[in-house]
Design a protein with these regions (language model features):
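Short, well-ordered alpha-helix to beta-strand connector turns
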Residues: 57, 80, 113, 154-155, ...
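C-terminal and late-domain segments of enzyme folds
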Residues: 1-26, 32-33, 37, 43-44, ...
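Catalytic-core regions built around general acid/base machinery
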Residues: 76-79, 100-113
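Short, active-site-adjacent cap segments at secondary-structure transitions
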Residues: 91, 123-126, 192-194
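Portal/gating segments that form or line small-molecule/metal binding sites
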Residues: 37-98
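A glycine-rich, often tryptophan-bearing local segment used as a flexible ligand/cofactor-contacting loop or short
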Residues: 106, 115, 124-142
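Catalytic nucleophile loop
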Residues: 84-87, 110-128
Length: 212
């Protein structure tokens, strides 16, 4: 059964993760893929997400797909309990995933039930295509990318950071341009889209002062 935890910011909704996983996550092993952030000047969100996983007690194995061999990638994806892909540039990420067939390895693992977690770019790639975020991410950072197909783990199109600074204007533009044409699912940094088999939900981090 397909299990996806698609976020704009994992660290913002980390408290919802264990409930979704349906098991104690302390001691579980996580393949942590920061590749999308390598071409970005701002990268604090990668550290924020890493710290959030560590706080939950997960054991992190960093997997840099742009430098790892296909064999190393396949082994890490197979041996870890969960797979996480960070935010950054969506087009560069997809370029690097396709170079060594990591995209196909991911699809195989996820279709076999491996729990997948994405932040921003790592969630966008679950969509059928990624072209719809070209106003948000620079395509020129992925000059070797020959097509804009995504992993197509879902039939909808994931849009992160909806109306959040500094993406307020660009996310609204994407909604205006694409929502009449495709099944666009915009979420804020405090929300997550979960996929459990055919069941799709949008959840929100509880506000302060509410019980959770």
């Amino acid at each position: 059964m397909k299990r996806l935890f698609l976020t704009s910011s994992f660290s913002s909704v980390a408290k919802l993760f264990e409930d979704f996983a349906g098991e104690p996550v302390k001691g579980k092993k996580l393949a942590f893929i920061p590749t999308a952030s390598l071409v970005e000047k701002v990268r604090f969100y990668v550290d924020d997400d890493r710290k959030a996983f560590e706080k939950l007690g997960l054991i992190i194995e960093e997997l840099e797909v742009s430098t790892a061999t296909t064999e190393e990638i396949a082994q890490a994806l197979e041996q870890n309990d969960y797979i996480f892909i960070s935010g950054g540039n969506t087009f560069y990420l997809m370029q690097e995933l396709k170079k060594k067939g990591t995209d196909k390895l991911l699809i195989e693992q996820i279709n076999n039930g491996k729990l997948y977690i994405g932040t921003s770019a790592g969630s966008i790639i679950a969509s059928p295509t990624i072209e719809f975020v070209s106003d948000m991410d620079e395509t020129k950072k992925a000059l070797e990318l020959t097509d804009y197909s995504g992993l197509h783990l879902v039939d909808f199109y994931f849009l992160p950071h909806y109306l959040n600074f500094p993406f307020k204007e660009v996310t609204q533009k994407i909604v205006n341009d694409y929502s009449p044409k495709i099944d666009l699912r915009p979420i804020s940094n405090n929300q997550v889209i979960t996929v459990l088999g055919n069941e799709i939900k949008t959840l929100e981090k509880p506000k302060r002062g509410t019980k959770k």
